[in-house]
Each structure stands twice: as structure tokens, then as C-alpha cells.
Regions:
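Residue-level signal for beta-strand positions within conserved beta-sheet cores that form or flank
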Residues: 1, 17-19, 96-98
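Local cysteine-cluster metal-coordination motifs and their immediate loop/turn environment
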Residues: 10-23
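A generic fold-level signal
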Residues: 11, 60-61
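Conserved non-cysteine loop/helix-boundary elements of the Radical SAM core domain that shape
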Residues: 24-54, 61-144
């Protein structure tokens, strides 16, 4: 049996009209709210889960898949995503052939961002392009 981890990043630049996922935009979060501490909180939660597993004698194999989904994980800094991945590695270990993916919005990444992810161990990016047809994008409230 494989051990796989999903890390939810519930932030988006804007809400898409069709989306039913648990997501938040800056407007939803309100004045003064910040995504800045999110990675640290996820890392703390990993430690809590690992402590619980240890207490209950649960020893998972190395992680075979790590998937960052959302929302739009790439609304966080690349260094935050890498820090969370590093915490997975330190907490459970990651298999040598693991698939490590983040969902991304083309509006939130550039070549430097992608390079930082690759250097940090990510080996797959899923760009959620819904359409290239302008009127379809307008209907979906999407930019891509």
C-alpha cells in the first residue's frame, strides 16, 4: 500500500464562477488578512499528525505522491511550497520515484518561480487551463 499526501492551499486570486472548492480570495479574507503564515501552520499540523501516528503505532512507508491542490497553491511564494515539501521529506521521507505535483495558475508563475519549485524537488505542475476560447473563459470567469 502506498502513502500519499494531499496539501490543500485554499487561496485564489479571484473566485471562478463554477468553483465549489473551499477557497478564499483576498476579498473573502478581509482587510489585514494574510496568507503569510499558512506554510508554517501546515508544517505544524504535519508534526501533530506524525505524533498521533507514532502514539498509535502507525509507521507509514515513504511518501509515494505529494499533491498540492487548491485553490491555487502558486498564490503562495515558491519558498513556502518548497518548505512544506521539505517538511514532508523530514517527517515521513519521500520515495526516490515520487511524483511531486502542484496545481498552478499561469497568472501566478514565471520561469524563476518554476525553477525554484524544480530545484526544491517538484517534478510536475498541473496548469488548470479550462479553455482558450474567449467567450468560454468569460462564461467561466477565468483568464485561462
Amino acid at each position: 500500500m502506498t502513502f500519499e499526501i494531499y496539501i490543500h492551499v485554499p487561496f485564489c486570486l479571484r473566485r471562478c464562477g463554477y468553483c465549489d472548492f473551499n477557497t478564499y480570495t483576498a476579498v473573502d479574507m478581509g482587510a489585514g488578512a494574510s496568507r503569510g503564515n499558512y506554510a508554517n501552520m501546515v508544517i505544524r499540523e504535519m508534526a501533530i499528525v506524525r505524533d498521533w501516528q507514532t502514539t498509535h503505532g502507525i509507521n507509514e512507508p515513504k511518501v509515494a505522491t505529494v499533491f498540492f491542490g487548491g485553490g491555487t497553491p502558486t498564490t503562495l511564494k515558491a519558498s513556502d511550497l518548497v518548505a512544506m515539501l521539505d517538511a514532508v521529506r523530514a517527517t515521513w521521507g519521500i520515495a526516490d520515484d515520487a511524483e511531486i505535483t502542484t496545481e498552478a495558475n499561469p497568472d501566478t508563475v514565471n520561469a524563476d518561480y518554476v525553477k525554484e519549485l524544480a530545484d526544491g524537488g517538484f517534478n510536475r505542475i498541473s496548469f488548470g487551463m479550462q479553455s482558450a476560447v474567449p467567450h468560454v473563459l468569460a462564461t467561466l470567469d477565468r483568464t485561462h
